[in-house]
Swiss-Prot record:
NCBIfam families, A to Z: GTPase_EngA, small_GTP
Domain EngA-type G: 2-168, 181-357
InterPro entries named among the record's database cross-references: G_ENGA, GTP-bd, GTPase_Der, KH_dom-like, KH_dom-like_a/b, P-loop_NTPase, Small_GTP-bd
Protein name, entry field: GTPase Der
Gene3D superfamilies the UniProt entry points to: 3.30.300.20, P-loop containing nucleotide triphosphate hydrolases
Lineage, highest ranks first: Bacteria, Thermotogati, Thermotogota, Thermotogae, Thermotogales
Role: GTPase that plays an essential role in the late steps of ribosome biogenesis.
GO molecular function, a single term: GTP binding
């Protein structure tokens, strides 16, 4: 796929331009310099044409620290490999020595370049005061745009497409598929894991290519379902440790199951509906929760349950009571043998993965915190100042408090509930908490 790179000195609006062209708020936009450190990329689709767009950090003429130097090196290396560069300058203030230095590097790199004058909301002023000096950079006619106000972006896109097609690049191909969602199917022996695994793979809409596995190892299958890529892992049944002989194949298979959970994004926990929820089911669910993996709970063999039409509430209550520590998981009733509700399992996996990879703004967290603390009594002497999300997979939140010692399990339950009820439900995903002392 053709790659188009956005480059320029800091704070000329590169990330705003990137977000508008990909039609997502993917790159962080702030007024301060150096907000973008790592390259951010996404696919641009425009009238059936597609290309990869990459937003880079601002290139400093003379980096003042090691990080800035490394950022500059990464950007300059990417320029050499790009099919096309969008060289963004400030359409209000004109060019500086930093612009001239970067222009010199671009010319020496012999890379195709489009000169983009951003922040050109006042076109007459731009034409009169800024445009004439831009020709000195050596890239011909500049394209004036205002990313913030969506001015002239169509003209820019037309020019990009034209330049790429002149190079003979294929723009008709579909966007590259992102990394696969890794799904492990786990449970006790004989609960129907392999049957569910096969039911998912046998969907008519699924294109399956096998990844070779080894006997007693987890069996992997790479699957495309509705354009999404998954790797499903069918694992061996997990028995209680006391029932597994040491130094046996089963013992090592259990290690492999745990390893599969570690490598998964989403774990489907399969239960035998004819047997309810056993202690071993609870242990397996606890293992998944402690490893911080997203989860979906499946009551399989639902076709064998007597009077099943009237027993959904009964089994849902059982789930909430015995697997209360993962009660955020979607609950699905299936018969893998008959193909019942396999679609719902796939939908639940997608939901859990979306939650697992969601990041919420700090403003939403602290607004909810302020609102709830107004009518909540914390332990005497405890103060929670503010919080922010610091990671995904799983969603992890850092709260600044005056005393970490006063944070006990009830306070952790309170904060998780606050996040799910007032910020984002994170259905299917655990929430991890961290605390830092602050005054």
């Amino acid at each position: 796929m053709a790659t188009v790179l956005i480059v320029g000195k800091p704070n000329v609006g590169k990330s705003t331009l990137f977000n508008k062209l990909v039609r997502k708020k993917k790159a962080i936009v702030e007024d301060e310099e150096g907000v973008t450190r790592d390259p951010v990329q996404d696919i641009v689709e425009w009238y059936g044409k597609t290309f990869k767009l990459v937003d880079t950090c601002g290139v400093f003429d003379n980096p003042q620290d090691i990080i800035s130097q490394k950022m500059k090196e990464i950007t300059l290396n990417m320029i050499r490999e790009a099919d096309l560069v969008l060289f963004v300058v400030d359409g209000k203030r004109g060019i500086t020595k930093e612009d001239e230095s970067l222009a010199d590097f671009l010319r020496k790199s012999n890379v195709d370049t489009i000169l983009v004058a951003n922040k050109a909301e006042n076109l007459r002023e731009f034409e009169r005061e800024v445009k004439p000096e831009l020709y000195s950079l050596g890239f011909g006619e500049p394209i004036p745009v205002s990313a913030e106000h969506n001015i002239n972006l169509d003209t820019l896109l037309e020019t990009i497409i034209k330049k790429l097609e002149e190079k003979g690049l294929d723009l008709e191909s579909k966007p590259e598929i992102t990394d696969a969602i890794k799904v492990a199917i786990v449970g006790r022996p004989n609960v129907g894991k392999s049957t569910l695994f096969n039911a998912i793979l046998n969907k008519e809409r699924a294109l399956v290519s096998p990844i070779p596995g080894t006997t007693r190892d987890p069996v992997d299958e790479e699957v495309f379902i509705d354009g999404k890529k998954y790797v499903f892992v069918d694992t061996a049944g997990l028995r209680r440790r006391s029932r597994v002989e040491p130094r046996t194949v089963e013992k090592y298979s259990n290690y492999r199951v745990v390893d599969s959970i570690e490598k998964a994004d989403v774990v489907v926990i399969v239960l035998d509906a004819t047997q309810g929820i056993t202690r071993q089911d609870q242990r397996i669910a606890g293992l998944v929760e402690r490893r911080g993996r997203a989860s979906v709970v499946v009551f399989n063999k639902w076709d064998l349950v007597e009077h099943r039409e009237k027993r959904h509430d009964e089994f849902t209550k059982l789930f909430r009571e015995k697997l209360y520590f993962i009660d955020y998981s979607p609950l699905i009733f299936t018969s893998a043998d008959k193909g019942w509700n396999v679609d719902r399992v796939i939908d639940a996996i997608n939901l859990a993965y979306a939650s697992y990879t969601t990041k919420v703004p700090s403003s939403a967290i602290n607004s909810a915190l302020q609102k709830v603390l107004a009518f909540t009594n914390l332990p005497r002497g405890l103060k929670i100042f503010f919080g922010l999300q610091v990671d995904i997979k799983p969603p992890t939140f850092l709260f600044f408090v005056n005393s970490i010692e006063k944070i006990k399990n009830p306070q952790k339950v309170f904060l998780r509930k606050l996040i799910r009820d007032y910020v984002f439900p994170f259905e299917g995903s655990p929430i991890f908490l961290k605390f830092k002392r602050s005054r």
